[in-house]
């Protein structure tokens, strides 16, 4: 049976995720179908797939999560080739040999390359050997401080994607070569590729030529073994268990190895796997931000977002709504807003209130880019293509990596915008003019003059954000005409993927920094609640003792002051006075005195009598408060530090608790103060390392594990 006779039907199956083909000649319906369902469900599927122990390659169903898993090589994942693909691969390889023997003139088989394709030769094998030699044009910078080697994760991703492309049987290469690359992957032998030197059209020629160089035993080829040791080609073959000698490339095989987009699309796959998770993390962190900032949850109401129509926005709002629904912080904030509606603005600032509108389009961009790259890694992207069924070689341009360049430019812009929102939220969080009662810089010490909290961290965040915004600039607009004006437009796909990888790395610095600050804010809210409760109890106790009765035991008019005194404690920001609660220059004592003075003025007739004068009681009240309150506040602090707080931490009753628990308990971080040695950078580093190891994924998804994929019903 002709292996390519049903090519059109196969394309339909591929585009429709393996489902039965339908009338969709332009593939738009399949592209739209792939975007059905929630982004969160898709991320969950990606994580699940990432953790599977085996990747079965057949050319049509490779996913970015599988590429990321093979690239990372931290899950013990192995690659297995589909035997069903062997016949198709062999058919195209045989066709090339037959066509050459029959005198057929084919690009890259009997002709020169690119702008010099007018040249002709009958030495097909020698031509492939020369192709690999002249494309080995990269610089590694060995022996210098400059590292010009492509990260091994990107190389492994490229190897996997290239195998997948060649398995489809349109490229004219032997199956044995694909098996050899698979053995290199499964034995963790990674060829050394140059970091720079490709314009991803005609494919990633220069870096891919170094994989071909290793397979053919070029003396300049190098690989890295499982333990980081440097291997030459012979040692690499032995370590991978490749029994044969080096490959003598047949006609077209060199071109099949180098003329494609897998380095750009492979790295793009790794980048997008992380970008999707970071997008979900940004949604959850925005909800936690609303909690610790005493935000008004009205900004997540479904009607607002339904009227805007954008699915990314609707989902982002629904996820935040789910986390805030039933949150103990939201309930407490509602009571505070009822006590004094004028204490804070009617509406929260944009970084909080419009976070769904901001993040929604970014999620859409990342999701669409993911699907675009997923199509690319399942594409046949070299030239010429061998159509065995029609007995011809098709000369086209599938090596043009524009889907990669455009998707990566767009993703990088989205990543930069996520970082911008994080920085805006972080800036509000550490600023006591905006953070609704938290201390400046989130300082937690007894003496704020010797604790500057997250000040250095805010400077670092500004640095991260600035670099990230610079990286948001497009790469694809900087195309240069190459190769004697034959490659006069080119995608710059790998360059864009590299820059997007840099952007993701920076966002991975910002995210743990921000989450550490949010955990600090959570702890400060807990401390604040306990300190305020102590102040309130102490003021009540002193008021009862000094203001209730007169010198002869009779009820005194000042007994009516207690309720208003406690209102002051409720309204006043605790950290505005708690380092010296009885200071006459701090707002607590000033406003408590003001209450007593106002009651005295309202009690004008009784003020003439020393026995009923409220004014005469002020000194006694203040002196006793000064004696008692500092001791009680210190006692409350000590109890908090010993884990014996009178009031438990509200976070334990919230859906955001799994992230807090992960940061504090699993990673062993703590509330930072100037009284301790540990620095903010140490804590951020712990979380950054854990994020790079993928450890944040499970607690993140646990926060929204109960979400049913829909907004709360309108009522």
UniProtKB/Swiss-Prot annotation:
GO terms for cellular component: cytoplasm. Signal peptide: none annotated. This is a key enzyme of plant metabolism catalyzing the first reaction in the biosynthesis from L-phenylalanine of a wide variety of natural products based on the phenylpropane skeleton. This is Phenylalanine ammonia-lyase. It is found in: Cytoplasm. It is an enzyme of class 4 (lyase). The gene is PAL17.1. PANTHER family: HISTIDINE AMMONIA-LYASE (PTHR10362). Its EC number is 4.3.1.24. The keyword Lyase applies. (E)-cinnamate binds at residues 259, 347, 353, 383, 455, 483, 486. Contains an active site 4-methylidene-imidazol-5-one (MIO), which is formed autocatalytically by cyclization and dehydration of residues Ala-Ser-Gly. Keywords: Cytoplasm, Lyase, Phenylalanine catabolism, Phenylpropanoid metabolism.
């Amino acid at each position: 049976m002709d292996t390519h006779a049903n090519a059109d039907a196969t394309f339909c199956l591929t585009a429709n995720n393996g489902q039965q083909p339908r009338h969709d000649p332009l593939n738009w319906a399949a592209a739209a179908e792939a975007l059905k369902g929630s982004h969160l469900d898709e991320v969950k599927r990606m994580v699940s797939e990432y953790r599977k122990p085996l990747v079965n390659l057949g050319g049509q169903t490779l996913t970015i999560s599988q590429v990321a898993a093979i690239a990372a090589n931290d899950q013990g994942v192995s690659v297995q080739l589909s035997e069903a693909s062997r016949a198709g691969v062999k058919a195209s390889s045989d066709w090339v040999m037959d066509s050459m023997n029959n005198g057929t003139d084919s690009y890259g088989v009997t002709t020169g390359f690119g702008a010099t394709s007018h040249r002709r030769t009958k030495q097909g094998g020698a031509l492939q050997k020369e192709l690999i030699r002249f494309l080995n044009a990269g610089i590694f910078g060995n022996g210098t401080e400059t590292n010009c080697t492509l990260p091994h994760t990107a190389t492994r991703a490229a190897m996997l994607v290239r195998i997948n492309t060649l398995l489809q049987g349109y490229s004219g290469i032997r199956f044995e070569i694909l098996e050899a690359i698979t053995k290199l992957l499964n034995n963790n032998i990674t060829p050394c590729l140059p970091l720079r030197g490709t314009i991803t059209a005609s494919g990633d020629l220069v870096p891919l030529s170094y994989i071909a160089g290793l397979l053919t035993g070029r003396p300049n080829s190098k690989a890295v073994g499982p333990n980081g040791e440097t291997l030459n080609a012979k040692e690499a073959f032995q370590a991978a268990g490749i029994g044969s000698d080096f490959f003598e490339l047949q006609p077209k095989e060199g071109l099949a190895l180098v003329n494609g987009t897998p380095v750009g699309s492979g790295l793009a796959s790794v980048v997008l796997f992380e970008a999707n998770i970071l997008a979900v993390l940004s949604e959850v962190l925005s909800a936690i931000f609303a909690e610790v900032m005493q935000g008004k949850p009205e900004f997540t109401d479904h009607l607002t977002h339904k009227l805007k129509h954008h699915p990314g926005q609707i989902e982002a709002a629904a996820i935040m709504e789910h986390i805030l629904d039933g949150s103990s912080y939201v309930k407490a904030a509602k009571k505070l807003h009822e006590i004094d509606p004028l204490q804070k603005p009617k509406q929260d600032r944009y970084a909080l209130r419009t976070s769904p509108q901001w993040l929604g389009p970014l999620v859409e961009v990342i999701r669409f880019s993911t699907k675009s790259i997923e199509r690319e890694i399942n594409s046949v992207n070299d030239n010429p293509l061998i159509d065995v069924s029609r007995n011809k070689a098709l000369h086209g341009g599938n090596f043009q990596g524009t889907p990669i360049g455009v998707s990566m430019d767009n993703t990088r812009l989205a990543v930069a915008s996520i970082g911008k929102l994080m920085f805006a939220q972080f800036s509000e969080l550490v600023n006591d003019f905006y953070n609704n009662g938290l201390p400046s810089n989130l300082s937690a010490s007894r003496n704020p003059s010797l604790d500057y909290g997250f000040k250095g961290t805010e400077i670092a965040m500004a640095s991260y954000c600035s670099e990230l915004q610079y990286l948001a600039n497009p790469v694809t607009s900087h195309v240069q005409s190459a190769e004697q004006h034959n490659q006069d437009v080119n995608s710059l796909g790998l360059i864009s993927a590299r820059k997007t990888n840099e952007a993701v790395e920076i966002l991975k610095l910002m995210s743990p920094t921000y989450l550490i600050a949010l955990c600090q804010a959570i702890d400060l809210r807990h401390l604040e609640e306990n300190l305020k409760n102590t102040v309130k109890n102490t003021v009540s106790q002193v008021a009862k003792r000094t203001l209730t009765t007169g010198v002869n035991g009779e009820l005194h008019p000042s007994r009516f002051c207690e309720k208003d005194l406690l209102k002051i404690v409720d309204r006043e920001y605790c950290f505005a006075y708690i380092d010296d609660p009885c200071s006459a220059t701090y707002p607590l004592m000033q406003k408590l005195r003001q209450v007593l003075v106002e009651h005295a003025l309202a009690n004008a007739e009784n003020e003439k009598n020393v026995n009923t004068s409220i004014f005469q009681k002020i000194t006694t009240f203040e002196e006793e408060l000064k004696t008692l309150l500092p001791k009680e506040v210190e006692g409350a602090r000590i109890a908090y530090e010993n884990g014996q707080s009178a009031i438990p931490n509200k976070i334990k009753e919230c859906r955001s608790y799994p992230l807090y628990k992960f940061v504090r308990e699993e990673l062993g971080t703590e509330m930072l103060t100037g009284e301790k040695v540990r620095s903010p950078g140490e804590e951020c580093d712990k979380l950054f390392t854990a994020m790079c190891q993928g450890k944040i994924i499970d607690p993140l998804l646990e926060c929204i594990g109960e979400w049913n994929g829909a907004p709360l019903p309108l009522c």
